Amino acid sequence: MDRQGWIAVILCIAGLVLWQWFYVKEYSRPPEPAGATATATPGTEPTAVTPTPTPERTLESPTRAAAPSISARSQSVSSKNAEYVFSNDAGGIEKAILLLHLAEQKQAVVLNGSRSMPIGAIGFQAGEVSGGFEMDRIGRNKQVVFRKTEEDGLEIIKTFTPPEDDASNPYAVGLEVAFRNTSSSKLTRDGFYVSTGGAAPIHAKDLPMYTKFDWNHGGKTTGIDVNWFNPGGIPFLGMQWSGAKSLYNELKPDILWAGVTSQYFCTIVTTEKTKGSSVWATRFNAQKLNETNVLGMQGALGLPPFSLAPGEKISETFSIYAGPKDLMLLRGMGGGQDDAMNFGMFGFISEFLLWAMNTIHGYLGNYAGSIIVLTLLIKSALWPVQNKATNEMRKMAALSPKMTEMREKFKDEPQKLNAEMMKMYREYGVNPFSGCLPMLIQIPIFFGFYAMLGSAIELRNSSFLWVTDLSQPDTLFRIVGFPVNILPIVMAGSMIWQMIITPKSGDAMQQRIFYFMPVIFLVFCYNYASALALYWTTQNIFSIVQLYLTRNKPLPELEKKSVVAKREAAATVKKKKRPKT
């Protein structure tokens, strides 16, 4: 490697350390203090505060609309997969406890347990939650009913129906919201919002970029993450050109669903009758994980305005999914809810890899083994391409002496040098870029794995050797606060090993690209799910074995295509002249 290459590698490593420092500093910082919110003193009713979607105002928690004083109480309903804790404070699911999924300290995963508003709570303005409900539990089907009558005579009845043990989707809760006009006058509302509850990292190492608010309108899914609320600028350079934002608010027709997601879990509210017309979302300061501040996201799905004549009643129905980001379960909910997986542009590759990994797991019963076997299958399928690329690179290596002579001859004429090089490649039938082909093919596969392994619930708490959780970085210890993750380091080492034994093409630009690849992949994988580093390390080792099988072969003796063509033509003529027996 030349001097410039070493300088670039050192700068990349320094960038990795700087990014790790900034990552911890930025995402451990709590959001700006909230502005004035509704407060209540004993014996008084809280005052409703109506937020407006302006960047200047901060909003950390939804306000409570004015409501009569009612004693707070909770009611739990359980199934074999989840326990739902209902609260009459805002008439919704205070938290959903997923009994089959473990979080820190081997405790069950709790959704919506981080100081956020209840799932299924309603409000009549963006950022507002209506409280003061009476709560009843009725029937054998575990239904929980909330009732409230507002001062103008609008009666609100909310009925939650948790899933049965044998339900096809064990995390889908039904919700009916009914409005009845008990007054003698016409009542009008400018629509209402149904809360998605909140989402926040479950594990201290979960990536904040997966804490998102997603919504689908007209079949198109849009989303923001917690960084959307940050001031515009470059924080570590002290540059800022726009202020922090506190409320995300959008008005769109034909909204099918809205939801909040963390890295491996999500809560989605889907309208089943009337299409939604608006959404809102805010960021909030969630409960600390391992003494680290984490940020959460909460939001709501809004329905259009309605009017009720005296005695008239209307109702809307919703489905609420509060559970793991399971592709099949989300796809079964319809309406493109599987977009909550956030697979991105290589989603079709991610879906295939997830299906293949789960299929192999059905035979092996181990996800680390499934990833290794899947990697070997992929490498075997790409063997013809890899073998052809290796042969082409060996041809390039055979031309290396000629290229050295040519560089010396035309060292002061770069354009002439390039022209002569390309002429030589054509004469000898060599493709100088063929060595990059296997890497170009594997890049989409890598990003498919990257997206899949970053969201696939299957990998949570799956172990491999020293790795306790394949969905998290494999940090063994820290040095001055910097995590030492072994698998990405082994992965980078295997890439360097592969680079050393790969036939040199003689092309300086191609060699420089190869030098950078270990550092680039190290940055990509260092703080990511260790399963990704396991995949790339496995494929590197398999490539090294392939290279060792071919490296001891002598370099090919190259001839110009014109010479080969003449010899073949002469052989053809000789064959035609041969007398028939």
Positions of predicted regions on the chain:
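Conserved catalytic motifs of ABC-family nucleotide-binding domains
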Residues: 449-494
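Membrane-protein biogenesis/insertion across secretory and organellar systems
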Residues: 1-380, 557-581
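Transmembrane alpha-helical segments that form the functional core of multipass membrane systems
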Residues: 339-408, 415-416, 422, 426, ...
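Active-site lining segments that contact anionic ligands and/or coordinate catalytic metals
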Residues: 6, 264, 298, 315, ...
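Transmembrane alpha-helices
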Residues: 433-448
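Terminal, Lys/Arg-rich, intrinsically disordered segments and adjacent short helical elements
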Residues: 1-62, 383, 387-434, 476, ...
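Membrane-water interface of transmembrane alpha-helices in multipass transporters/channels
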Residues: 369, 458-467, 508-513
